[in-house]
Swiss-Prot record:
Family, as annotated: Belongs to the UPF0391 family.
Keyword Transmembrane helix: yes
Membrane topology: Multi-pass membrane protein
KW Cell membrane (keyword) present: yes
Protein name: UPF0391 membrane protein Nham_2738
GO cellular component terms attached to this protein's record: plasma membrane
Keywords carried by this UniProt record: Cell membrane, Membrane, Transmembrane, Transmembrane helix
Transmembrane segments: 4-24, 30-50
Domain of life of the source: Bacteria
Predominant location: membrane
UniProt-annotated location(s): Cell membrane
């Protein structure tokens, strides 16, 4: 649980530096790209999980 606290603290510090440093526009675009990559990976993972689950049954 402590590792999650440290992880979110680091993310918050980086977001604060980028937000208050004037790089908010660039960080928004990067966040959009990372979000869509994460959604695509989630969908691929879900489909692969469903296909593997059906073959074992």
């Amino acid at each position: 649980m402590l590792s999650w606290v440290v992880t979110f603290l680091i993310i918050a510090l980086i977001a604060g530096i980028l937000g208050f440093g004037g790089l908010a526009g660039a960080s928004v675009e990067i966040a959009k790209i990372i979000f869509f990559i994460a959604v695509i990976l989630f969908v691929v993972s879900a489909v692969v999980g469903l296909l593997r689950g059906r073959t074992r049954v």
